[in-house]
Amino acid sequence: MNSRLTTFAVVLTACSHVLAETDNPMSLAEGRVVLGIELQTRFEFRDNNFDFNSAAGTINDDSWLLNRLRLNVKVQPTPWMTFFAEGQDSQEIGSQRPDRPGALGAEGDNTFDLRQAWFELGDVKSFPLTLKAGRQVLLYGDQRLIGPLDWNNISRTFDAAKLRWHGRDGLWVDLFTSSVVVPDRGGFDESNWNSVFSGLYAHIPTLELQDTELYVLHLRDTNLGHAFFTFGTHLKSQPEALGSWDYEAEFAVQTGRAGGRDLRAFASYVEGGYTFDHPWKPRVGLEYSYGTGDGNPADGDQGAFQNLFPTNHLHYGLIDAFSWSNLHDVALHLSVKPMAKLTTSLEFHVFWLDDTADTWRRANAATPVRAANPAASNYAGSELDLTVAYTVCDSFRVMAGYSHFFAGDYLAATGASSDADFLYLMTNLKF
């Protein structure tokens, strides 16, 4: 009871500061030192999400609570120098799954560890180059290839060095090299420099119509036998540039070596939407996503698109059964804002595998849902996702969602084919 009252008091205090439009209470030394805190709690219920088999109850057919606490400090002694450090504690409570992150699908426990620690040098008002080095978040485009995976309770960061050139009118170009940080429940989270991820990424506003992004990415992983390039472009219309219409698209090709095999792969998505002139701002969108699969796992060629370091939860259904590889996904998006602080959305996805000779991989782009079966139908199933988000104040949000997966012919031909359900309720306090 006391903990609930304490939480309520913290939320009330945070919101009252915003409503009163006071200065940031976490800002010290005339803004040169800023403290931050984020507390996120998510209740989840999952049934048949991993095996699509209602006849065999597993430790993943259960409910649990995910807690995440982040504490950070930002210090800016001069306009051209910034330091930032952030610690994170992640816990999975009430689950029978292993405590180790990733084991049997578990979010796992990762007791207070260093999530970010970086410094940034440069003042764009004086010189157009800045350098950011240390443990940091990398996020580009709509996170289909590079993102922090923030839905995951531990999330993702990189030990990286990033040089950015700042041009005019929102133009910028990044050059970076990095290694992803691997969570270690029993010790300090560290990166593995046997895996090096580098890239050149440019953001180019175009004729006040769209944002155009061009990139060249390279992943070298000596443990996995990877050494390949990803060349691509991401396009997104600017707000109201086309009136009520909007669009977004991305195209990427890969070449090199993946898993010791010659890689030739492709991925793309195209989305268009229309927002009606109504106080609730209803939007209807249609999206198609495609990632190549591998037609013959036994030969020396690899045709499956390598999904790199994405946040796939945002794109291919909330149950997280798919990645941007060996995939056809047609999705209908509906959203409305009945109130300024309330957003509701409904999505319906229909999924096919690109090639049934290849594995169906989950959202982490690695874990197989089922072994390949070339003789099976490529229709995997469909998914309905309903989400509701309410912003109590700038510092506090409440979100809830329900998803149902309708099992398709591929599941029926390869084993159990029960439908799956996912339900969550999440709160996020941040200031």
Residue ranges, per PLM feature:
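Structural signature of outer-membrane beta-barrel domains
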Residues: 42-46, 82, 86, 90-94, ...
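Transmembrane beta-strand segments of Gram-negative outer membrane beta-barrel proteins
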Residues: 24-54, 82-85, 171, 210, ...
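Signature for the C-terminal beta-barrel architecture of outer-membrane proteins
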Residues: 127-131, 148-298, 337, 350, ...
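Outer-membrane beta-barrel transmembrane domain signature
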Residues: 325-329, 333-385, 391, 405, ...
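Outer-membrane beta-barrel biogenesis signature
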Residues: 15-39, 45, 58, 298-301, ...
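Outer-membrane beta-barrel "beta-signal"
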Residues: 386, 418-431
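Surface-exposed loop and membrane-interface regions of Gram-negative outer-membrane beta-barrel proteins
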Residues: 49-67, 75-127, 140-148, 186, ...
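Cleavable N-terminal export/targeting peptides
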Residues: 1-23
